[in-house]
Amino acid sequence: MARSRNRFDRTPFQTAITDLSHDGRGVARRDGEGGKVTFISGALPGEVVVAEPTARSRHFDEAKTVEVLQASPQRVAPRCPHFGVCAGCVLQHLEESQQIVAKQRVLMDNLERIGHVTPQTVLPALVGDTWGYRRKGRFSVRRVEKKDKTLVGFRELDPRFVADLSVCYTVIPQIGEKIPQLAALVEGMDGKRDIPQIEFIAGDDAVALTIRHLQPLSARDEQALVEFAQAHDFAIFLQPGGVDSVHPLWPQEVPLSFRLPKWDVELAFRPLDFIQVNASLNQKMIAHALALLDAKPDDRVLDLFCGLGNFTLPLARTVREVVGVEGDAGLVARARENAQRNGLDNAQFYAADLTQDQRQTAWMRQGFDKLLLDPPRSGAIDVLQQLPLKQFKRIVYVSCHPGSLARDAGYLVNEQGFSLLSAGAMDMFPHTAHVESIAVFEKR
Protein backbone atom coordinates (compact mmCIF):
# COMPACT_ATOMS: atom_id res chain seq x y z
CA MET A 1 0.00 0.00 0.00
CA ALA A 2 1.48 3.33 -1.05
CA ARG A 3 1.58 6.03 1.58
CA SER A 4 -0.70 8.79 0.37
CA ARG A 5 -0.14 12.46 1.16
CA ASN A 6 -3.25 14.54 1.77
CA ARG A 7 -3.19 17.98 0.23
CA PHE A 8 -2.60 20.33 3.14
CA ASP A 9 0.33 22.37 4.38
CA ARG A 10 2.86 20.08 6.06
CA THR A 11 5.32 22.83 6.89
CA PRO A 12 6.82 22.17 10.37
CA PHE A 13 5.89 24.70 13.04
CA GLN A 14 7.07 25.62 16.52
CA THR A 15 4.64 25.42 19.43
CA ALA A 16 4.35 25.07 23.21
CA ILE A 17 2.70 21.99 24.72
CA THR A 18 0.14 22.73 27.44
CA ASP A 19 -1.32 19.33 28.32
CA LEU A 20 -1.31 15.57 27.68
CA SER A 21 -4.33 14.05 25.93
CA HIS A 22 -6.08 10.87 27.01
CA ASP A 23 -4.25 8.96 24.26
CA GLY A 24 -0.80 10.17 25.29
CA ARG A 25 -0.25 13.00 22.82
CA GLY A 26 0.82 16.53 23.61
CA VAL A 27 -1.84 19.24 23.32
CA ALA A 28 -1.08 22.61 21.75
CA ARG A 29 -3.07 25.61 20.56
CA ARG A 30 -1.30 27.05 17.56
CA ASP A 31 -2.91 30.47 17.59
CA GLY A 32 -2.78 31.21 21.29
CA GLU A 33 -5.38 30.60 23.99
CA GLY A 34 -8.37 30.51 21.66
CA GLY A 35 -6.66 28.70 18.80
CA LYS A 36 -7.41 25.38 17.20
CA VAL A 37 -6.20 22.36 19.16
CA THR A 38 -3.40 20.25 17.71
CA PHE A 39 -2.57 16.80 19.11
CA ILE A 40 1.15 16.12 18.76
CA SER A 41 2.62 12.63 19.17
CA GLY A 42 5.92 12.44 21.05
CA ALA A 43 5.44 15.73 22.92
CA LEU A 44 5.03 16.35 26.66
CA PRO A 45 3.46 19.17 28.71
CA GLY A 46 5.78 22.10 29.30
CA GLU A 47 7.83 21.44 26.19
CA VAL A 48 8.50 23.59 23.16
CA VAL A 49 8.70 21.46 20.03
CA VAL A 50 8.90 21.62 16.28
CA ALA A 51 6.07 19.51 14.88
CA GLU A 52 5.08 18.36 11.41
CA PRO A 53 1.36 18.29 10.56
CA THR A 54 0.06 14.80 9.74
CA ALA A 55 -3.72 15.25 9.56
CA ARG A 56 -6.26 18.03 9.56
CA SER A 57 -9.93 18.06 10.48
CA ARG A 58 -12.59 20.63 11.20
CA HIS A 59 -12.25 20.53 14.98
CA PHE A 60 -8.59 19.66 15.56
CA ASP A 61 -5.29 18.97 13.80
CA GLU A 62 -2.70 16.23 14.32
CA ALA A 63 1.08 16.38 14.13
CA LYS A 64 4.24 14.54 15.11
CA THR A 65 7.27 15.86 16.96
CA VAL A 66 10.35 16.30 14.79
CA GLU A 67 12.51 18.27 17.25
CA VAL A 68 12.33 19.07 20.97
CA LEU A 69 13.58 22.62 21.56
CA GLN A 70 12.80 22.76 25.28
CA ALA A 71 12.44 19.39 27.01
CA SER A 72 10.30 18.55 30.01
CA PRO A 73 12.29 17.43 33.09
CA GLN A 74 10.04 14.35 32.99
CA ARG A 75 11.27 13.33 29.53
CA VAL A 76 13.45 10.20 29.35
CA ALA A 77 15.14 8.40 26.47
CA PRO A 78 12.79 5.71 25.12
CA ARG A 79 14.18 2.21 25.54
CA CYS A 80 12.66 0.92 22.31
CA PRO A 81 14.33 1.69 18.95
CA HIS A 82 10.88 1.72 17.32
CA PHE A 83 9.35 4.36 19.59
CA GLY A 84 7.68 7.06 17.54
CA VAL A 85 6.75 4.67 14.75
CA CYS A 86 5.14 1.66 16.46
CA ALA A 87 1.79 2.26 18.16
CA GLY A 88 2.32 -0.55 20.66
CA CYS A 89 3.27 1.97 23.35
CA VAL A 90 3.29 5.76 23.15
CA LEU A 91 4.55 6.93 26.57
CA GLN A 92 8.09 5.56 26.73
CA HIS A 93 9.44 9.12 26.59
CA LEU A 94 7.66 9.96 29.87
CA GLU A 95 9.24 8.96 33.19
CA GLU A 96 7.52 5.83 34.52
CA SER A 97 6.39 7.45 37.78
CA GLN A 98 4.74 10.22 35.78
CA GLN A 99 2.94 7.87 33.41
CA ILE A 100 0.64 6.65 36.16
CA VAL A 101 0.19 10.23 37.43
CA ALA A 102 -1.05 11.13 33.96
CA LYS A 103 -3.43 8.15 34.00
CA GLN A 104 -4.80 9.16 37.40
CA ARG A 105 -5.45 12.60 35.95
CA VAL A 106 -7.28 11.13 32.94
CA LEU A 107 -9.45 9.04 35.27
CA MET A 108 -10.37 11.95 37.54
CA ASP A 109 -11.06 14.21 34.57
CA ASN A 110 -13.43 11.64 33.07
CA LEU A 111 -15.26 11.10 36.36
CA GLU A 112 -15.83 14.84 36.80
CA ARG A 113 -16.48 15.80 33.16
CA ILE A 114 -18.62 12.82 32.06
CA GLY A 115 -20.07 11.42 35.28
CA HIS A 116 -20.22 14.67 37.28
CA VAL A 117 -18.86 12.76 40.27
CA THR A 118 -15.77 13.06 42.47
CA PRO A 119 -14.46 10.24 44.68
CA GLN A 120 -14.20 10.92 48.38
CA THR A 121 -10.72 9.35 48.27
CA VAL A 122 -8.26 8.97 45.41
CA LEU A 123 -6.71 5.52 45.73
CA PRO A 124 -2.93 5.19 45.38
CA ALA A 125 -2.13 3.95 41.90
CA LEU A 126 -1.52 0.22 41.55
CA VAL A 127 1.60 -0.75 39.58
CA GLY A 128 3.28 -4.02 38.60
CA ASP A 129 5.96 -5.09 36.16
CA THR A 130 6.71 -2.38 33.60
CA TRP A 131 8.87 -4.29 31.09
CA GLY A 132 8.38 -7.76 29.62
CA TYR A 133 4.90 -7.88 31.13
CA ARG A 134 2.66 -8.40 28.12
CA ARG A 135 1.69 -12.07 28.08
CA LYS A 136 -1.12 -11.82 25.54
CA GLY A 137 -1.37 -9.93 22.28
CA ARG A 138 -1.78 -9.97 18.53
CA PHE A 139 0.83 -9.23 15.89
CA SER A 140 -0.21 -8.14 12.44
CA VAL A 141 1.56 -9.96 9.60
CA ARG A 142 2.06 -8.46 6.16
CA ARG A 143 4.08 -9.46 3.13
CA VAL A 144 5.47 -6.21 1.65
CA GLU A 145 6.41 -6.83 -1.96
CA LYS A 146 8.32 -3.55 -2.39
CA LYS A 147 10.59 -4.49 0.51
CA ASP A 148 10.62 -8.17 -0.49
CA LYS A 149 10.05 -9.18 3.12
CA THR A 150 7.40 -10.15 5.65
CA LEU A 151 6.67 -7.82 8.57
CA VAL A 152 5.49 -9.12 11.95
CA GLY A 153 4.61 -6.55 14.59
CA PHE A 154 2.08 -4.13 16.01
CA ARG A 155 0.51 -1.43 13.86
CA GLU A 156 2.34 1.83 13.28
CA LEU A 157 0.98 5.11 14.60
CA ASP A 158 -0.48 5.31 11.11
CA PRO A 159 -2.64 2.16 11.47
CA ARG A 160 -2.56 1.41 7.76
CA PHE A 161 0.96 0.06 8.19
CA VAL A 162 2.68 -2.69 10.17
CA ALA A 163 5.76 -1.72 12.18
CA ASP A 164 8.97 -3.48 11.16
CA LEU A 165 10.06 -4.62 14.63
CA SER A 166 13.42 -6.03 15.68
CA VAL A 167 12.37 -6.36 19.33
CA CYS A 168 9.56 -5.45 21.73
CA TYR A 169 10.47 -4.82 25.35
CA THR A 170 6.92 -4.70 26.71
CA VAL A 171 6.09 -8.20 25.45
CA ILE A 172 7.33 -11.18 27.46
CA PRO A 173 10.97 -11.86 26.43
CA GLN A 174 10.18 -15.32 25.04
CA ILE A 175 8.18 -13.53 22.32
CA GLY A 176 9.50 -9.97 22.26
CA GLU A 177 13.08 -11.06 21.54
CA LYS A 178 12.08 -13.43 18.74
CA ILE A 179 10.05 -11.18 16.44
CA PRO A 180 12.69 -11.24 13.64
CA GLN A 181 12.75 -15.05 13.81
CA LEU A 182 8.95 -15.09 13.56
CA ALA A 183 9.10 -12.84 10.50
CA ALA A 184 11.76 -15.05 8.91
CA LEU A 185 9.64 -18.12 9.62
CA VAL A 186 6.63 -16.67 7.81
CA GLU A 187 8.79 -15.32 4.97
CA GLY A 188 10.02 -18.85 4.31
CA MET A 189 6.52 -20.34 4.12
CA ASP A 190 4.58 -21.10 0.93
CA GLY A 191 1.52 -19.43 2.49
CA LYS A 192 3.24 -16.24 3.64
CA ARG A 193 0.68 -14.06 1.83
CA ASP A 194 -2.22 -15.86 3.51
CA ILE A 195 -1.24 -15.24 7.16
CA PRO A 196 -2.75 -11.95 8.42
CA GLN A 197 -1.99 -12.28 12.14
CA ILE A 198 -0.24 -14.25 14.87
CA GLU A 199 -1.63 -14.23 18.40
CA PHE A 200 0.51 -15.03 21.42
CA ILE A 201 -0.45 -16.00 24.94
CA ALA A 202 1.61 -17.25 27.87
CA GLY A 203 0.70 -19.30 30.88
CA ASP A 204 2.99 -20.07 33.78
CA ASP A 205 4.40 -23.17 32.05
CA ALA A 206 3.87 -22.69 28.30
CA VAL A 207 3.83 -20.06 25.56
CA ALA A 208 1.46 -20.52 22.62
CA LEU A 209 1.30 -18.97 19.16
CA THR A 210 -1.91 -19.09 17.12
CA ILE A 211 -1.35 -18.76 13.38
CA ARG A 212 -4.34 -17.33 11.50
CA HIS A 213 -4.28 -18.57 7.89
CA LEU A 214 -6.73 -17.78 5.10
CA GLN A 215 -5.83 -20.80 2.94
CA PRO A 216 -4.88 -24.37 3.94
CA LEU A 217 -1.20 -24.68 4.86
CA SER A 218 1.06 -27.00 2.91
CA ALA A 219 2.68 -29.98 4.60
CA ARG A 220 5.99 -28.15 4.20
CA ASP A 221 4.65 -25.08 6.03
CA GLU A 222 3.23 -27.17 8.86
CA GLN A 223 6.58 -28.91 9.26
CA ALA A 224 8.35 -25.54 9.36
CA LEU A 225 6.00 -24.41 12.14
CA VAL A 226 6.60 -27.60 14.13
CA GLU A 227 10.37 -27.25 13.83
CA PHE A 228 10.16 -23.59 14.90
CA ALA A 229 8.04 -24.54 17.90
CA GLN A 230 10.47 -27.26 18.94
CA ALA A 231 13.49 -24.97 18.53
CA HIS A 232 11.99 -22.12 20.59
CA ASP A 233 9.83 -24.05 23.07
CA PHE A 234 6.50 -22.77 21.77
CA ALA A 235 3.16 -24.48 21.32
CA ILE A 236 1.61 -23.85 17.90
CA PHE A 237 -2.11 -23.60 17.20
CA LEU A 238 -3.70 -23.10 13.80
CA GLN A 239 -6.77 -20.97 13.07
CA PRO A 240 -8.16 -21.54 9.56
CA GLY A 241 -11.51 -19.84 10.33
CA GLY A 242 -13.36 -18.44 13.33
CA VAL A 243 -12.51 -18.87 17.00
CA ASP A 244 -14.00 -22.37 17.05
CA SER A 245 -11.60 -23.51 14.31
CA VAL A 246 -8.51 -23.15 16.54
CA HIS A 247 -6.72 -26.47 17.01
CA PRO A 248 -3.25 -27.58 18.14
CA LEU A 249 -0.57 -28.36 15.58
CA TRP A 250 2.21 -29.20 18.04
CA PRO A 251 2.12 -30.53 20.67
CA GLN A 252 -1.35 -32.04 20.88
CA GLU A 253 -1.67 -31.37 24.62
CA VAL A 254 -0.68 -27.91 25.89
CA PRO A 255 -0.88 -27.01 29.61
CA LEU A 256 -2.05 -23.39 29.35
CA SER A 257 -2.81 -22.03 32.82
CA PHE A 258 -1.73 -19.47 35.40
CA ARG A 259 -1.66 -19.72 39.17
CA LEU A 260 -2.89 -17.33 41.85
CA PRO A 261 -0.87 -18.60 44.85
CA LYS A 262 -2.46 -16.33 47.46
CA TRP A 263 -5.78 -18.12 46.94
CA ASP A 264 -4.39 -21.54 45.96
CA VAL A 265 -6.13 -21.26 42.59
CA GLU A 266 -5.04 -22.32 39.10
CA LEU A 267 -6.92 -21.07 36.03
CA ALA A 268 -6.69 -23.03 32.78
CA PHE A 269 -7.43 -21.27 29.49
CA ARG A 270 -7.39 -21.73 25.72
CA PRO A 271 -5.13 -19.85 23.31
CA LEU A 272 -7.65 -17.16 22.28
CA ASP A 273 -9.30 -16.73 25.68
CA PHE A 274 -9.24 -13.37 27.44
CA ILE A 275 -6.77 -13.18 30.30
CA GLN A 276 -5.35 -10.09 32.00
CA VAL A 277 -2.24 -9.01 30.13
CA ASN A 278 0.02 -8.16 33.08
CA ALA A 279 0.46 -11.15 35.41
CA SER A 280 2.05 -9.29 38.33
CA LEU A 281 -0.50 -6.47 38.21
CA ASN A 282 -3.34 -8.98 37.92
CA GLN A 283 -2.45 -10.62 41.24
CA LYS A 284 -2.22 -7.22 42.95
CA MET A 285 -5.50 -6.14 41.34
CA ILE A 286 -7.38 -9.20 42.61
CA ALA A 287 -6.14 -8.66 46.17
CA HIS A 288 -6.94 -4.94 45.90
CA ALA A 289 -10.47 -5.58 44.60
CA LEU A 290 -11.30 -8.15 47.28
CA ALA A 291 -10.01 -5.83 50.01
CA LEU A 292 -12.04 -2.90 48.65
CA LEU A 293 -15.12 -5.12 48.40
CA ASP A 294 -14.66 -5.87 52.10
CA ALA A 295 -15.60 -9.48 51.36
CA LYS A 296 -16.80 -11.32 54.48
CA PRO A 297 -17.11 -15.09 55.07
CA ASP A 298 -20.94 -14.91 55.12
CA ASP A 299 -21.29 -12.78 51.97
CA ARG A 300 -23.01 -13.78 48.74
CA VAL A 301 -21.26 -11.96 45.90
CA LEU A 302 -22.30 -11.39 42.29
CA ASP A 303 -19.37 -11.23 39.84
CA LEU A 304 -20.41 -9.83 36.44
CA PHE A 305 -18.32 -10.21 33.26
CA CYS A 306 -16.46 -12.93 35.16
CA GLY A 307 -14.55 -14.52 32.26
CA LEU A 308 -12.53 -17.56 33.32
CA GLY A 309 -13.16 -16.80 37.00
CA ASN A 310 -10.22 -14.45 37.56
CA PHE A 311 -12.03 -12.77 40.47
CA THR A 312 -14.72 -15.40 41.03
CA LEU A 313 -12.51 -18.22 42.23
CA PRO A 314 -10.43 -16.12 44.65
CA LEU A 315 -13.77 -14.81 45.95
CA ALA A 316 -14.96 -18.39 46.40
CA ARG A 317 -12.01 -18.94 48.75
CA THR A 318 -13.16 -15.91 50.75
CA VAL A 319 -16.98 -15.76 50.88
CA ARG A 320 -19.90 -18.12 51.44
CA GLU A 321 -21.04 -18.16 47.83
CA VAL A 322 -20.26 -16.36 44.57
CA VAL A 323 -22.15 -16.28 41.28
CA GLY A 324 -20.24 -15.45 38.10
CA VAL A 325 -22.00 -14.28 34.93
CA GLU A 326 -20.30 -13.99 31.53
CA GLY A 327 -21.44 -13.49 27.95
CA ASP A 328 -18.94 -15.87 26.34
CA ALA A 329 -20.29 -19.42 26.77
CA GLY A 330 -16.82 -20.88 26.18
CA LEU A 331 -15.36 -18.86 29.03
CA VAL A 332 -18.24 -19.93 31.27
CA ALA A 333 -17.50 -23.58 30.49
CA ARG A 334 -13.83 -23.03 31.36
CA ALA A 335 -14.80 -21.19 34.57
CA ARG A 336 -16.90 -24.16 35.67
CA GLU A 337 -14.03 -26.52 34.86
CA ASN A 338 -11.65 -24.29 36.81
CA ALA A 339 -13.95 -24.28 39.84
CA GLN A 340 -14.13 -28.07 39.75
CA ARG A 341 -10.38 -28.39 39.24
CA ASN A 342 -9.77 -26.21 42.29
CA GLY A 343 -12.32 -28.05 44.45
CA LEU A 344 -14.63 -25.05 44.77
CA ASP A 345 -18.30 -25.99 45.01
CA ASN A 346 -19.53 -22.58 46.22
CA ALA A 347 -19.09 -20.89 42.81
CA GLN A 348 -21.93 -20.95 40.27
CA PHE A 349 -21.59 -19.73 36.69
CA TYR A 350 -24.15 -18.56 34.15
CA ALA A 351 -23.80 -17.63 30.48
CA ALA A 352 -25.76 -14.46 29.68
CA ASP A 353 -25.53 -11.52 27.30
CA LEU A 354 -25.32 -8.67 29.79
CA THR A 355 -26.35 -6.11 27.18
CA GLN A 356 -29.79 -7.77 26.93
CA ASP A 357 -32.76 -8.07 29.30
CA GLN A 358 -31.83 -10.50 32.11
CA ARG A 359 -34.56 -9.61 34.63
CA GLN A 360 -36.27 -13.00 34.44
CA THR A 361 -33.13 -15.13 34.72
CA ALA A 362 -32.45 -17.35 37.71
CA TRP A 363 -29.26 -15.56 38.72
CA MET A 364 -30.85 -12.10 38.55
CA ARG A 365 -33.57 -13.15 41.00
CA GLN A 366 -31.11 -14.35 43.63
CA GLY A 367 -30.18 -12.15 46.57
CA PHE A 368 -26.65 -10.80 47.02
CA ASP A 369 -24.72 -8.71 49.49
CA LYS A 370 -22.06 -7.26 47.21
CA LEU A 371 -21.29 -6.77 43.52
CA LEU A 372 -18.00 -6.95 41.65
CA LEU A 373 -17.90 -6.22 37.94
CA ASP A 374 -15.18 -6.03 35.28
CA PRO A 375 -16.93 -5.06 32.03
CA PRO A 376 -15.45 -4.51 28.55
CA ARG A 377 -14.73 -1.05 27.16
CA SER A 378 -18.42 -0.40 26.55
CA GLY A 379 -19.09 -0.51 30.29
CA ALA A 380 -22.01 -1.97 32.23
CA ILE A 381 -24.88 0.49 31.97
CA ASP A 382 -27.26 -2.06 30.38
CA VAL A 383 -27.04 -4.53 33.23
CA LEU A 384 -26.80 -1.88 35.96
CA GLN A 385 -30.17 -0.51 34.83
CA GLN A 386 -31.73 -3.96 35.34
CA LEU A 387 -30.20 -4.98 38.66
CA PRO A 388 -32.04 -4.46 41.96
CA LEU A 389 -29.19 -2.28 43.14
CA LYS A 390 -30.59 -1.56 46.60
CA GLN A 391 -29.52 -5.02 47.78
CA PHE A 392 -25.80 -4.30 47.33
CA LYS A 393 -24.02 -2.95 50.38
CA ARG A 394 -20.94 -2.29 48.26
CA ILE A 395 -19.97 -2.33 44.58
CA VAL A 396 -16.42 -2.65 43.24
CA TYR A 397 -16.12 -1.71 39.57
CA VAL A 398 -12.97 -2.66 37.64
CA SER A 399 -12.75 -0.71 34.40
CA CYS A 400 -10.67 -0.76 31.22
CA HIS A 401 -12.16 2.50 29.89
CA PRO A 402 -12.44 5.64 32.06
CA GLY A 403 -15.18 7.14 29.90
CA SER A 404 -17.63 4.27 30.35
CA LEU A 405 -16.73 4.00 34.05
CA ALA A 406 -17.51 7.71 34.45
CA ARG A 407 -20.88 7.34 32.72
CA ASP A 408 -21.79 4.35 34.91
CA ALA A 409 -20.53 6.09 38.05
CA GLY A 410 -22.79 9.03 37.24
CA TYR A 411 -25.75 6.66 37.03
CA LEU A 412 -24.94 4.96 40.34
CA VAL A 413 -24.31 8.20 42.24
CA ASN A 414 -26.70 10.69 40.67
CA GLU A 415 -29.64 8.38 39.96
CA GLN A 416 -29.35 5.38 42.29
CA GLY A 417 -28.23 6.91 45.57
CA PHE A 418 -24.72 5.47 45.86
CA SER A 419 -21.63 7.29 47.10
CA LEU A 420 -18.36 7.05 45.19
CA LEU A 421 -16.09 6.20 48.09
CA SER A 422 -12.85 5.91 46.16
CA ALA A 423 -11.28 5.45 42.75
CA GLY A 424 -7.80 5.07 41.33
CA ALA A 425 -5.81 4.03 38.29
CA MET A 426 -4.03 0.71 37.81
CA ASP A 427 -1.13 0.42 35.36
CA MET A 428 -2.06 -2.78 33.53
CA PHE A 429 -0.35 -1.52 30.33
CA PRO A 430 2.79 0.47 31.25
CA HIS A 431 4.21 2.77 28.55
CA THR A 432 0.82 2.90 26.81
CA ALA A 433 -1.97 5.42 27.25
CA HIS A 434 -4.41 2.67 28.29
CA VAL A 435 -6.09 3.49 31.63
CA GLU A 436 -7.25 0.60 33.81
CA SER A 437 -8.99 1.70 37.00
CA ILE A 438 -11.03 0.63 40.00
CA ALA A 439 -13.87 2.37 41.83
CA VAL A 440 -15.80 1.63 45.03
CA PHE A 441 -19.46 2.53 45.57
CA GLU A 442 -21.53 2.25 48.73
CA LYS A 443 -25.25 2.73 49.24
CA ARG A 444 -26.06 6.01 50.97
Curated annotation (Swiss-Prot):
Top EC category: transferase
Residues where [4Fe-4S] cluster binds: C80, C86, C89, C168
Catalytic-site annotation from UniProt: C400
Catalytically driven reaction(s): uridine(1939) in 23S rRNA + S-adenosyl-L-methionine = 5-methyluridine(1939) in 23S rRNA + S-adenosyl-L-homocysteine + H(+)
Keyword Aminoacyl-tRNA synthetase listed: no
Binding site for S-adenosyl-L-methionine: Q276, F305, N310, E326, D353, D374
GO terms for biological process, alphabetical: rRNA base methylation
Superkingdom, natural source: Bacteria
Record domain TRAM: where: 5-67
EC number in record: 2.1.1.190
One Pfam family named in its UniProt record: TRAM
Presence of the UniProt keyword Transferase in the record: yes
Keywords for the protein's UniProt record, in alphabetical order: 4Fe-4S, Iron, Iron-sulfur, Metal-binding, Methyltransferase, rRNA processing, S-adenosyl-L-methionine, Transferase
GO MF annotations in UniProt: 4 iron, 4 sulfur cluster binding; iron ion binding; RNA binding; rRNA (uridine-C5-)-methyltransferase activity
Homology family: Belongs to the class I-like SAM-binding methyltransferase superfamily. RNA M5U methyltransferase family. RlmD subfamily.
Stored PANTHER family: 23S RRNA (URACIL(1939)-C(5))-METHYLTRANSFERASE RLMD, RNA M5U METHYLTRANSFERASE
Function text: Catalyzes the formation of 5-methyl-uridine at position 1939 (m5U1939) in 23S rRNA.
Name of the molecule in the record: 23S rRNA (uracil(1939)-C(5))-methyltransferase RlmD
Organism: Xanthomonas campestris pv. campestris (strain ATCC 33913 / DSM 3586 / NCPPB 528 / LMG 568 / P 25)
